[in-house]
A protein has these predicted regions:
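ABC ATPase nucleotide-binding domains
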Residues: 2-4, 8-155
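Residues that scaffold the ATP/ADP-binding catalytic core of kinase and kinase-like folds
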Residues: 90, 97, 159, 214, ...
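Glycine-centered loop/turn positions within well-structured domains
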Residues: 121, 145, 154, 166, ...
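C-terminal boundary and immediately downstream tail of ABC-type ATPase nucleotide-binding domains
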Residues: 150-179, 205, 275
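Non-catalytic connector elements of ABC transporters
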Residues: 173-286
Length: 286
């Protein structure tokens, strides 16, 4: 399929104006100057570069240079646009703005965008579907919600979001629950149709925001279908929208808990209970 590409670097011709950069591909196709000018003007309006046709690349901001590169690729009207980490050279806020812009552009032009990135937030915000690729192999694909909330693969669970990973051994199981030994402690999870056997080595994952910190409590709550283990607060960090707690478990593993608000009367070195719903844990056999 005819494909255009947007590179990691801006890759603009420094001796050409914005208009000349965007229209260069059409010029190579021997399109008439009047047609090129009309198409470039429309494309500049589409990507938010109106009035900048005579500017040189060094006179543009990083975001404007990236828009020029996008316009130069889109004006060829190919079936697919391949974007190779296109926002990596931009600062954090500009990346967020460009994610919104890319989403809008894709809906407007209606072609397939293949966006390559290592940035999770970038992928989640621009994609209709996400493919996780490692060592040349596609491990899984799905909607952003599916990939984040229900990863099928241990690598995906570690890579997407802030999840805690536990390695352990299946102690027992029935049609409802599974008990896994993680070393000096056991974790009970909901059996969601997993095909497992006793003494099997498995991995568990749980999102850091799915764990609740409770002080001075050490009992399971069967009525609410929750379970918990004990730990010690090793670090408390304020990160703006949430507070991150690091909790040291008896097996020596340190896990993250993200809370939208401060847990009252909790300080460093306090003994706490970590509480979760049984269904919040996912089991991975690879």
């Amino acid at each position: 399929r005819p494909t255009s590409m947007v590179f990691q670097g801006f890759a603009l011709f420094p001796h050409m104006s914005v208009l000349e950069n965007i229209g260069y591909g059409l010029k190579l196709k021997s399109i008439e100057k009047e047609v090129i000018f009309t198409k470039v003007t429309k494309m500049m309006d589409l990507v938010g570069l109106t009035g900048l046709s005579k500017r040189m690349p060094h006179e543009l901001s990083g975001g404007q240079q990236q828009r020029v590169q996008l316009a130069r690729a889109l004006i060829l009207e190919n079936d697919v646009l391949l974007l190779d980490e296109p926002l990596s050279a931009l600062d954090a806020q500009l990346r967020k703005d460009m994610c919104i812009e890319l989403k809008r552009l894709q809906k407007t032009v209606g072609i397939t965008f293949v966006h390559v990135t290592h940035n999770q937030e970038e992928a989640m915000s621009v994609a209709d579907r996400i493919a996780i690729i490692a060592d040349g192999e596609m491990l899984e694909e799905g909607t952003p919600e599916e990939i984040y909330s229900n990863p099928k693969n241990k690598f995906t669970a570690e890579f997407i979001g802030e999840k805690n990973i536990f390695n352990g051994t299946v102690v027992s199981f029935n049609t409802k629950n599974i008990t896994i030994d993680i070393g000096n402690d056991t974790i009970e999870i909901l059996n969601q149709g997993y095909k497992i056997k006793k003494n099997q080595k498995v991995s568990l994952s749980i999102k850091s925001e799915s764990i609740e910190i409770i002080k001075n409590q050490n009992k399971s709550d069967d009525k609410l279908k929750v379970a918990q283990i004990m730990g010690t607060i090793s670090e408390i960090t304020f990160l703006g929208q949430f507070i991150r707690y690091l909790v040291l478990l008896k097996n020596g593993q340190e896990i993250q808990v993200r809370s939208p608000k401060e847990v009252k009367n909790i300080k460093l070195n306090d003994k706490v209970s970590l509480k979760w719903k049984l269904e919040d844990f996912l089991l991975h056999q690879k």
